UniProtKB/Swiss-Prot annotation:
A Pfam family matched in the record: ATP-synt
Keywords: ATP synthesis, Cell inner membrane, Cell membrane, CF(1), Hydrogen ion transport, Ion transport, Membrane, Transport
Keyword Nuclease annotated: no
Gene Ontology biological process terms in this record: proton motive force-driven plasma membrane ATP synthesis
Subunit structure: F-type ATPases have 2 components, CF(1) - the catalytic core - and CF(0) - the membrane proton channel. CF(1) has five subunits: alpha(3), beta(3), gamma(1), delta(1), epsilon(1). CF(0) has three main subunits: a, b and c.
Main location: membrane
Function of the molecule: Produces ATP from ADP in the presence of a proton gradient across the membrane. The gamma chain is believed to be important in regulating ATPase activity and the flow of protons through the CF(0) complex.
Organism of origin: Brucella anthropi (strain ATCC 49188 / DSM 6882 / CCUG 24695 / JCM 21032 / LMG 3331 / NBRC 15819 / NCTC 12168 / Alc 37)
InterPro entries per the UniProt record, alphabetical: ATP_synth_F1_ATPase_gsu, ATP_synth_F1_gsu, ATP_synth_F1_gsu_CS
Name of the protein this chain belongs to: ATP synthase gamma chain
Similarity annotation: Belongs to the ATPase gamma chain family.
């Protein structure tokens, strides 16, 4: 049984930890609001751009279609761009994204496909490296980035397009976590090269408007598709930041509550043990007095 001194030290230690988790919860809450606003602001733009591109794509067929839209005509080599957080202490946020990417990679490998991986964020890279170290061809470090900007996504997009033009892969899938609420972040896989069938369906439901394009649709697609790839990556990164802050706020709130419960239990144990010690000392005093 621990001594009273040990119990006092443990209570003090847990209280210090509770202050840290409470502070981290408040910081995450402050960052969450800005991150959520940024993610929600990016959604309409990225969704509308995808719909416009899909609408234009309906007017471009055959040899006129850009390679980024038409693809290579093969399905042999897959590139997975896995976006996670640079830091932990956010519950299962990173592991859920990594698990989705891992399961997808396993499925492709079981089908005899070739898989290549680009990791964005340290935590996801650490998880995937345990099983797919030889498949990771590049890692993007955003740890020193204080304010996420479009240029960071654009650099990743250019890297992906460069690999595609070099014939390094046939299909590219983006993995991230879509922010729904503080307690709900949904791991998501989005095919960005070639354009997925979902984009075409989105265009078909966009309305019956008829557009005239200047210059020709093929030229517009050649310019907009590379930018759309960067836009989709930027949206994924913004969704991730919001999801990370939401998960961190929830995790630190749980940690703070658990610390409070532990302090209560330790305090009860301390008080009982102290009471027992006082009772024992009183009995010894009374026994000594009676002996006299």
């Amino acid at each position: 049984m621990p001594s009273l001194k040990d119990l006092r030290n443990r209570i003090a230690s847990v209280k210090a930890t509770q202050k840290i988790t409470k502070a981290m919860q408040m910081v995450a809450a402050a960052k969450l609001r800005r991150a959520q606003e940024a993610a929600e602001a990016a959604r309409p733009y990225s969704q509308r751009m995808g719909a416009v591109l899909a609408n234009i794509a309906q007017n471009v067929t055959g040899e006129d279609a850009p390679a980024l839209m038409a693809g290579t005509g093969k399905d042999d080599v897959h590139l997975l761009v896995v976006c996670t957080a640079e830091r932990g202490l956010c519950g299962g946020f990173n592991s859920q994204i990594a698990r989705l990417a891992r399961d997808h990679a396993r499925k492709l490998l079981a089908e005899g496909k070739t898989v290549k991986i680009i990791t964005v964020g340290k935590k996801g890279a650490d998880i995937l490296r345990r099983e797919f170290a030889s498949l990771i061809i590049d890692h993007v470090n955003l740890r020193e980035v204080k304010q996420l900007a479009f240029v960071h996504a654009d650099q990743i997009g250019h890297k992906v397009i460069e690999l595609f033009e070099q014939g390094e892969f046939d299909v590219c899938t983006l993995f991230y976590s879509e922010f729904k609420s503080v307690i709900a972040q949904i791991p998501t896989a989005q095919q960005i090269i070639p354009a997925s069938a979902g984009d075409v369906a989105q265009a078909e439901t966009a309305g019956d408007a008829i557009y005239e394009y200047e210059p020709d649709p093929a030229a517009i697609l050649s310019t907009l598709i590379p930018r759309n790839i960067s836009v989709q990556i930027f949206r994924a990164l913004l969704e991730n930041v919001a999801g990370e802050m939401g998960a961190k706020m929830s995790a630190m709130d749980n940690a703070t509550r658990n610390a409070g419960d532990m302090i209560n239990k330790l305090s009860i144990t301390y008080n009982r043990q102290r009471q027992a010690q006082i009772t024992k000392e009183l009995i010894e005093i009374i026994s000594g007095a009676e002996a006299l």
